[in-house]
Amino acid sequence: MMKKALLLVALVMLTTMTMTAIAQQAVPPENAPVPAMPKEATRTGKRVNRIIDMWLKGQPVYYSQISGGGYEQGKQMAATKADYITYEMEHGPLDFKELREFMRGLLEAGPTRTGHKTPAVIVTLPIPGTTDALRANAWMIQQALAAGVHGILLCNAESPEAARLMIEAARYPFAPRVDGLAQGTRGNGSQAYASRMWGVTAEEYMRIAEPWPLNPDGELLFGLKIENPRADANVETSVRVPGIAFAEWGPGDHGFYVMGRPGTYKDGGETSPQMAAVRRRVLNATKAAGIKFLNACNENTVIDQLKEGVMICTGGDSPAADKGRAFTKRTDPW
């Protein structure tokens, strides 16, 4: 019994020492150089991220979606009218090699009509948006960013803590300090391929691979899918996490919880009062937080959606998107 007790004490001491060492490593030395957060963008000319360019002009953006695909699919989609492409790996194959090849195809078949090297690419991942899942799977966020994408949409984003962990996983340890965020954890080497996809030096990539608009020089966008009642309960807090730029309300998954089936529409409107209430809550939360709201749009609803404040619409290559671009008098090439 005495040996077991001593062994238990030793294990507890070892665990405590290990956790203390990890905690100490997470705190930068007092003399470590920490750049100040710029108050406004210091770069001039076209942004890397086409979405940001459009938003800075007050324009809504439109996206298309692909579930996986490599080099050839990237080449084919380089000519899209869409401002960005959702590369769907929540339910599609989780294949980071293919993602890298897709980005290379976009780059080599570019530039876009607007003069950007590629359309922006936002990735979804099979990470449940809970605190424990984010702690265990932050590597997926870092792998996606290392492929040169322009942002992450966190699915089933249930808690502010999960949103915060996503942002911290995406930032480098030397990034400007931000109240409400711990030091970033993204590692050296992640800049090599990504900087080539962006057409910048590795050093410049590490400076601008930051969440926008938190960092005015940032070129990365991070969003939340509010898709279930647990996420609804925290939405007003989650959307205020530093570094979050947009959110959507996930009607398909919400329908499972509210109606026992995927959400249904009639001309874009919700057929269930409960679903309409969920959408309204998420929309109001984004407006209060000063971030963008994403919603499905079709030809019958796109104008009303834009009037309501929707700044991200589906159907990047569709007549609905063309109708929306004309309504907001977009001057950039379609």
PLM region spans:
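Sec/Tat signal peptide C-region and signal peptidase I cleavage site
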Residues: M19-A23
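Bacterial N-terminal signal peptides that target proteins for export
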Residues: M1-V9
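Bacterial N-terminal signal peptides
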Residues: V9-M17
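Expand to "…catalyze enediolate/carbanion chemistry for C-C bond making/breaking, isomerization
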Residues: Q24-W334
